[in-house]
């Protein structure tokens, strides 16, 4: 087995053309957006944007990346994120070039775009994406201020004791702050927040944004979920400030965060105009 691995690595080094493996949806989107999609030789089963990335050979998911399949794709570079330390160590041990990034904040998303732009010699395109993000952020200030905003991840059609919300250590926090408002949820714990209805009532958010990419275009079903949340005795339901964002990009920290910021701007304008 070891002999086979070293033969594969030797073959990789003989290749002149860049052969890229992307290990997360956000990295995959950025690489494609920079115009390097034709060089992506493998990605994960969660990398489904842009459309052509669905046809790229798959090497597993978040928790089951196949090291053997990565090697079989003969990459010149593997680009991933910092949440699979063991895989990253194994790749380094085998002499595979790896680029590892964080994309949890707006700053880290922009840095990732710029760094990959430099790596692929696509600096101008990368700067354009970063400028678009900055311009979108600048546009959301002072529309409404001092509101408590709660962003809910993949809400169900009934309220439960396991409601996933965005905490204070993700890019959503940066977006809310840039708008002059605050996250209704607060904790110094960086772990993924899971709350129940009692905690939401105690938070008493003024605005609720429900991320529903699984219901893209299914407006009746989205309204059903909104109606469930309207039953809660909170400001957001009393003031009819419960909204959905049904696009996949809302949960992917890539250059397309620009589009979520623009969606959030429309929500804030709707709140203001009531």
Predicted regions and their residues:
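A short, structured surface patch at a secondary-structure boundary
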Residues: 19-83, 181-184
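Structured C-terminal subdomain patch of bacterial secreted/periplasmic proteins
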Residues: 18-19, 65, 110-118, 125-132, ...
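His/Asp/Glu-enriched short active-site or ligand-binding loop at hydrolase and phosphoryl-transfer sites
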Residues: 44, 166-192, 212, 244
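Flexible loop/hinge segments that line or gate small-molecule binding clefts
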Residues: 49, 83, 87-119
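Sec-dependent N-terminal signal peptides
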Residues: 3-15
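Basic- and aromatic-lined ligand-binding clefts that recognize polyanionic substrates
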Residues: 18-34, 125-179
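A ligand-binding cleft/hinge motif common to bilobed small-molecule-binding domains
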Residues: 85-93, 207-226
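Proline-aspartate-enriched helix->loop->beta-strand connector
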Residues: 59, 64-80, 96, 196-213
